[in-house]
Regions:
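Bacterial C-terminal helix-turn-helix
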Residues: 2-69
Length: 69
């Protein structure tokens, strides 16, 4: 996994992707994946992510995540 992540970061740096854009895209994909794996159950997803459900709800809103499982 470290090798894949290193390759991805190298590619993003070479393409001039800004840190904030990379962080936002990672967060959006990571959170969406966890929610989908939890069958759309936000309480379970929040527990899996190690955050409070309210924090997850705020993150979903901030990241404009839609079409959850």
């Amino acid at each position: 996994m470290h090798k894949l992540l290193e390759q991805l970061v190298d590619e993003m740096v070479n393409r001039g992707v800004h840190y904030e854009d990379a962080q936002r895209e990672f967060d959006k994909r990571f959170v969406t994946q966890v929610i989908n794996k939890c069958g759309g159950n936000l309480c379970k997803a929040a527990d899996t992510l190690g955050v409070h459900r309210n924090t997850l709800s705020r993150k979903i809103k901030d990241l404009k995540i839609k079409n959850l499982a």
